[in-house]
């Protein structure tokens, strides 16, 4: 067996990589990672140096780990700025560090990619190789962000420190229509959701869906301009550039969906989603101004509508946002796993994460008490 470090995802054949990924997580596909690298959003100049690990046995690809060497903590959605500050104050370098993640994509998915799901030996070899690489390259630490529930116990068994967090997800309980879904709400919460949707309709706003295969350059230019405007209104630039978005339509046409809001036949807002056969993932949002309840409608209600129509089992709209709860999303635990070379810092962070995890548990319990569902209808 041999573990190799790749300095680009293009150093491995697309079909080989995708055979490990499967179809559930489109943003783990070779095309997504390749576009991110080749359009410049993920590159050494941007602080993301690819260090992907592949494990081969007799020439056959057995397992892989998406991995990057980073000199900052932007685009991760698992916040370790305080750790970096503590290192700096103690006279140590926190950067570079190794991060296993999908860049700018806070969606739980497999990290320890294996040809056979039960190949725990391969997972252990990858984890050991990643920590060894961290030592060999003078990285302070290894961070595995948003692993799925199958990876978490393997990472814990390998000695990584687990960190718990919370997102809000929607689950399809076999709803035939949106109204059937709303019927599971209490009366007051159902009225609020209907009022949200009514406000948008009363403003003369309509919606259309565009699949990746139907996008052209003009459509992507319009969607990207809306997304970029919203990012810049918040004082930042989009994580990905327009070339990346245009590439998605070409390379992943069956996995991309945009919902475009229009008023007087003019586009005023757009949300971009990824989809698999079973799930919808909300990723990017933009508008040309403020419209009452439009964000809720475009990013949440329209997505739920689409899931019900297509029979998707769950909808993950992105990070943070307690406002999602009133729209039918419920708390879901997410994880990250961390290895730090410095033993004293590792011990201190482990103690901190133990307390943080208890706080997250209390927070999720409190949120559970305020979901909009009737007694007996709650999704938790």
Residue ranges and their predicted role:
Residues 1-380:
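N-acyltransferase acceptor-side catalytic subdomain
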């Amino acid at each position: 067996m041999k573990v190799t470090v790749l300095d680009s995802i293009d150093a491995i054949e697309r079909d080989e990589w995708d055979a490990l990924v499967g179809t559930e997580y489109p943003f783990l596909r070779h095309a997504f990672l390749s576009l991110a690298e080749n359009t410049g959003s993920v590159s050494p100049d941007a602080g993301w140096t690819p260090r992907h690990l592949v494990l081969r046995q007799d020439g056959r690809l057995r397992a892989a780990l998406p991995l990057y060497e980073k000199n900052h903590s932007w685009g991760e959605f698992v916040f370790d700025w305080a750790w970096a500050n503590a290192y700096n104050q103690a006279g140590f370098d926190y950067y570079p560090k190794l991060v296993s993640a999908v860049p700018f994509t806070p969606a739980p998915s497999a990290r320890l990619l294996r040809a056979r799901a039960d190949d725990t030996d391969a997972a252990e070899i990858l984890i050991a190789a990643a920590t060894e690489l961290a030592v060999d390259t003078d990285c302070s630490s290894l961070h595995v962000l948003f692993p799925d529930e199958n990876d978490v116990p393997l990472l814990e068994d390998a000695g990584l420190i687990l960190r718990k967090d919370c997102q809000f997800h929607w689950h399809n309980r076999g709803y035939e229509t949106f109204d059937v879904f709303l019927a599971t709400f209490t009366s007051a919460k159902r009225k609020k959701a209907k009022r949200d949707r009514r406000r948008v309709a009363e403003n003369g706003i309509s919606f259309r869906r565009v699949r990746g295969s139907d996008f052209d350059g003009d459509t992507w230019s319009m969607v990207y301009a809306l997304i970029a405007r919203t990012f810049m209104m918040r004082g930042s630039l989009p994580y990905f550039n327009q070339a990346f978005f245009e590439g998605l339509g070409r390379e992943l046409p069956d996995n991309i969906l945009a919902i475009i809001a229009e008023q007087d036949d003019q586009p005023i807002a757009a949300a971009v989603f990824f989809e698999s056969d079973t799930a919808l993932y909300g990723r990017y949002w933009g508008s040309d101004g403020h419209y009452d309840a439009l964000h809720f409608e475009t990013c949440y209600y329209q997505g739920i509508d689409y899931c019900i129509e297509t029979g998707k089992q769950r909808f993950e709209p992105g990070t943070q946002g307690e406002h999602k709860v009133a729209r039918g999303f419920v708390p879901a635990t997410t994880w990250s796993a961390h290895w730090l070379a410095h033993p004293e810092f590792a011990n201190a962070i482990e103690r901190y994460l133990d307390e943080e995890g208890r706080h997250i548990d209390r927070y999720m319990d409190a949120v559970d008490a305020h979901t909009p569902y009737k007694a007996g209808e709650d999704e938790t």
